[in-house]
């Protein structure tokens, strides 16, 4: 009985230590999520506007650019998978990998070979363990991505896209990105989006007056100047979405773990008290029994 009581007290101490860790992780995630949301909300308008600008530019100038014209026979598709560097964030990474596998299956069904690019140690470890060939990886900034990180990634993607699969074995015909879209603290969803070639929506002619644009120095030069910025901001916005989603998932997961630790400590404490009560009762019974035996001996 004494051994059982010691075991229960040891388990209570162990759970208490784990609770301190999960509570600390919860507080850290909570403190960082506000800054992540501010950065995300600041970047979203720019991402929307530059996409609208390029779409308008392509529509008005009728450009013939690789970013706009899909390859007649696409062979390879580059896929950028955005994951986290650390765990303890619930099903965040599992959902990203599941959505990535769905995209890979879809690309293969279309006769395209996926070329993998990853952000985050979790994706790097996941695909390395499964013997996937990883073309390029970037780690160490999943929680707090910077524009410079996105620019470096986008530069690599632009280079392989402009090469094309017909010109080089290192080139790709399409660029896709898998990331987690942040909607609220309680809602995030994994998305797979095509970044290149761009999808340009050509609207029907309207009877209403429309804005006329003048492009200087010319539409092609302007488009090529904006192209790196477009892909950079698309990657940066996706990384900010994923960072906010990662922190929200970690905050929820750690809060749930802390609450479960509280419940387990209460249950173990109750069981330990019962064991202690039984031990005291047994000791009292032994004392009373001994006293009665001495009284009868007299």
UniProtKB/Swiss-Prot annotation:
Gene from which the chain derives: atpG
PANTHER family in UniProt: ATP SYNTHASE GAMMA CHAIN, ATP SYNTHASE SUBUNIT GAMMA, MITOCHONDRIAL
Record function comment: Produces ATP from ADP in the presence of a proton gradient across the membrane. The gamma chain is believed to be important in regulating ATPase activity and the flow of protons through the CF(0) complex.
UniProt-recorded name of the protein: ATP synthase gamma chain
The family this protein is said to belong to: Belongs to the ATPase gamma chain family.
Record has Transferase as a keyword: no
GO molecular function annotation: ATP binding; proton-transporting ATP synthase activity, rotational mechanism
Keyword annotations: ATP synthesis, Cell membrane, CF(1), Hydrogen ion transport, Ion transport, Membrane, Transport
Any one annotated GO CC term: proton-transporting ATP synthase complex
Compartment annotation: Cell membrane
Presence of the UniProt keyword Secreted in the record: no
Taxonomic lineage from the root: Bacteria, Bacillati, Actinomycetota, Actinomycetes, Mycobacteriales
Protein topology in the membrane: Peripheral membrane protein
Subunit structure comment from the entry: F-type ATPases have 2 components, CF(1) - the catalytic core - and CF(0) - the membrane proton channel. CF(1) has five subunits: alpha(3), beta(3), gamma(1), delta(1), epsilon(1). CF(0) has three main subunits: a, b and c.
GO biological process, one term: proton motive force-driven plasma membrane ATP synthesis
Coiled-coil boundaries: none
Main location per the UniProt record: membrane
Stored Gene3D superfamilies: 3.40.1380.10, ATP synthase, gamma subunit, helix hairpin domain
Pfam families: ATP-synt
Classification via HAMAP family: ATP_synth_gamma_bact
Source species of the chain: Mycobacterium leprae (strain TN)
């Amino acid at each position: 009985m004494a051994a059982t009581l010691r075991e229960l007290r040891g388990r209570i101490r162990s759970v208490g230590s784990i609770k301190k860790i999960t509570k600390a992780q919860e507080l850290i995630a909570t403190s960082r999520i506000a800054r992540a949301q501010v950065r995300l909300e600041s970047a979203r308008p720019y991402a929307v506007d530059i996409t609208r600008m390029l779409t308008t530019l392509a529509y008005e100038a009728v450009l013939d650019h690789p970013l706009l014209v899909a390859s007649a026979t696409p062979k390879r598709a580059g896929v950028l998978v955005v994951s986290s560097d650390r765990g303890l964030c619930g099903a965040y990474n599992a959902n990203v990998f599941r959505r990535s596998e769905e995209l890979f299956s879809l690309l293969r069904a279309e006769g395209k070979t996926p070329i993998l690019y990853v952000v985050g140690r979790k994706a790097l470890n996941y695909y390395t363990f499964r013997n996937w060939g990883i073309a390029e990886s970037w780690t160490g900034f999943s929680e707090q991505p910077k524009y410079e990180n996105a620019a470096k990634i986008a530069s690599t993607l632009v280079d392989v896209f402009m090469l094309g699969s017909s010109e080089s074995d290192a080139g790709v015909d399409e660029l896709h990105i898998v990331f987690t879209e942040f909607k609220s603290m309680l809602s995030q969803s994994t998305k797979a989006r095509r970044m290149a070639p761009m999808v340009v929506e050509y609207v029907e002619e309207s009877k209403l007056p429309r804005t006329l644009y003048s492009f200087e120095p010319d539409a092609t030069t302007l488009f090529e100047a904006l192209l790196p910025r477009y892909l950079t901001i698309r990657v940066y916005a996706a990384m900010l979405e994923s960072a906010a989603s990662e922190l929200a998932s970690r905050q929820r997961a750690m809060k749930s773990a802390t609450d479960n630790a509280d419940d387990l400590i209460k249950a173990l404490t109750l069981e330990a008290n019962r064991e202690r009560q039984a031990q005291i009762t047994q000791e009292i019974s032994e004392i009373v029994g001994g006293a009665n035996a001495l009284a009868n001996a007299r």
